[in-house]
Design a protein with these regions (language model features):
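N-terminal glycine-rich anion-binding loop in soluble enzyme alpha/beta folds
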Residues: 1-52, 116-156
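Short active-site oxyanion
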Residues: 68-72, 91-92, 178-182
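Gly/Ser/Thr-rich loops at beta-strand to alpha-helix junctions
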Residues: 71-83, 98-101, 115-119, 183-188
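Short, acidic/small-residue loops that bind anionic groups at enzyme active sites
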Residues: 85-107
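Non-catalytic positions within long, well-ordered alpha-helices that form the structural scaffold/packing
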Residues: 62-68, 106, 173-175
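Glycine-rich, highly charged phosphate/nucleotide-binding loops
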Residues: 45-63, 160-168
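Charge-patterned, long linear interaction tracts outside catalytic cores
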Residues: 160-188
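N-terminal active-site wall of soluble small-molecule enzyme domains
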Residues: 55-59, 75-85, 89
Length: 188
């Protein structure tokens, strides 16, 4: 079986089984490639450096394809912003974000839970052909989740992150009771 390539942000936080950055999350071959110098802050930025991000994505997509990857994914849902550009630049098929699933969930009332509600913009949804008015909920900026995954912490309090995620999902559904499906933007 030929491998899937994973474009990884340059991070140091723990990656537990289930995280896209942990090889144990897959029962097929994967190749990881760290985009040196491109971290969580770059990907989740309110105003990302688009030329720098695209250059890193292109360079690393080409390298993964040269290593034999037959398709690519990424370690950050915010990279949805570059889906259409990367489709043109990559020598192999690419799926940048779980947000791509929204368009396939026709007939569902979809909400999105994200690492940063304030930085997930209509442009991210447009880049994956999803409705711009999709309800969005986020984890708090002062959360254990943010300490680990947005601020690149060295430790992970799994229980705290679970509580925070469940609370954020409940708050999203309480605010938008029509939601019957939640897509998680974040791969962590």
């Amino acid at each position: 079986m030929k491998p899937l390539g994973i474009l990884m942000l340059d991070t140091r936080f723990p990656r537990i089984v289930g995280d896209i950055g942990n090889p144990g999350s897959f029962d097929y071959p994967v190749i990881f490639r760290r985009m040196v110098g491109i971290g969580s802050k770059d990907a989740v930025a309110a105003h990302p450096d688009r030329p720098r991000m695209l250059a890193a994505l292109k360079e690393n997509a080409e390298a993964l394809a040269a290593e034999g990857a037959v398709g690519l994914s990424t370690s950050c849902g915010f990279l949805a912003l570059y889906q259409k550009d990367l489709e043109k630049l990559s020598p192999v098929p690419v799926a940048t974000s779980a947000l791509l699933h929204i368009r396939s969930l026709s007939g569902k009332k979809v909400g999105v839970l994200t690492a940063s509600a304030e930085n997930l913009t209509p442009a991210h949804f447009a880049a994956v052909d999803a409705p711009a008015d999709t309800p969005v909920g986020g984890l708090p900026a002062d959360s254990s989740f943010a300490d680990t995954f947005l601020r690149n912490g060295l430790t992970l309090d799994r229980d705290a992150v679970e509580r925070e995620t469940v609370a954020a999902a409940r708050a999203l559904v309480a605010k938008h009771p029509q939601i019957d499906t939640i897509v998680f933007e974040c791969t962590n």
